A protein has these predicted regions:
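A conserved beta-strand-to-alpha-helix junction within the catalytic ATP-binding
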Residues: 2-17, 29-31, 49
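Conserved micro-motifs of the catalytic ATP-binding
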Residues: 1, 40-43
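Conserved small/polar residues in nucleotide/adenosyl-binding loops
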Residues: 215-221
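Glycine-rich G1-box
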Residues: 21, 93-94
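Glycine-rich ATP-lid/hinge loop adjacent to the conserved G-boxes
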Residues: 108-119
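Short conserved segment of the HATPase_c
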Residues: 95-107
Length: 222
């Protein structure tokens, strides 16, 4: 992880606003709320952007036209650490009770469902959970079949929550985030150039491509 000190409120607002055109096109009521006490914080922009992109995209994917999706961010302050709570709520198809314990397992697709806007690889939520674990964060889901789901993320945002070697104190100018079809992973490969090898991976599923990139990059660093 590359933890920087940045304006978290603006970062969350920028990401939220990129989903407004998508909501309009599907006639889905989309709302977002960011608590006023969320401001400057410590977090990995790349990880958090990918997590929110995946969770919000899933919410829209499984919510029929005319439904609703909401995103909220609040702050919980303990004696030592500040933890941000993110909630993504949708009025979509929901998750069957028998599938709920397994939704963060790799390649788990669950039962066939009546509505979704695109096919799933079964790794999107597993990928999201593993990204969050890299960030010392947790994720959980509550869902009711036919009524929708709520995904809750608890993310530490204080300097003290992270090892010194993760912290980057020089913060470049924040760039405006944009909704895109693919969220590239930041390159972390530290293998010397003359020892690197090329792996050709042919796959048209974006989630699977991102997931394989994550693991091949990790393997190269070992």
């Amino acid at each position: 992880p590359h933890i920087v000190c940045a304006d978290l409120s603006r970062f969350l607002e920028d990401i939220s606003e990129t989903f407004i055109p998508l909501a309009d096109s599907y006639k889905i009521a989309f709302t977002y709320s960011i608590a006023p006490d969320i401001s400057i914080a410590y977090f990995d922009k790349n990880i958090l952007e990918q997590v929110l992109y995946n969770l919000l995209s899933n919410a829209f994917k499984y919510t029929p036209d005319g439904g609703s999706v909401s995103f909220s961010a609040s702050l919980e302050q303990s004696s030592s650490d500040a933890v941000m709570t993110l909630r993504i709520t949708d009025s979509g198809i929901g998750i069957p009770p028998e599938s709920l314990p397994y939704i963060f397992d790799r390649y788990y697709k669950g039962a066939s469902i009546a509505f979704r806007r695109s096919e799933s690889s079964g790794i999107g939520l597993a990928y999201t959970k593993e990204l969050l674990e890299l960030h010392k964060a947790t994720i959980q889901c509550e869902s009711e079949l036919g009524k929708g789901s709520v995904f809750t993320v608890a993310l530490p945002i204080s300097e003290e929550a992270y090892p010194e070697e993760w912290l980057e104190y020089s913060e470049p100018k924040m760039e405006e985030v944009s909704l895109r079809e693919s969220v590239p992973l930041e390159e972390t490969n530290s293998v010397p150039e003359n020892l690197r090898q090329t792996l050709l991976f042919v796959e048209d599923n974006e989630d699977l491509c991102r997931y394989c990139l994550l693991y091949t990059s990790d393997a190269a660093d070992e």
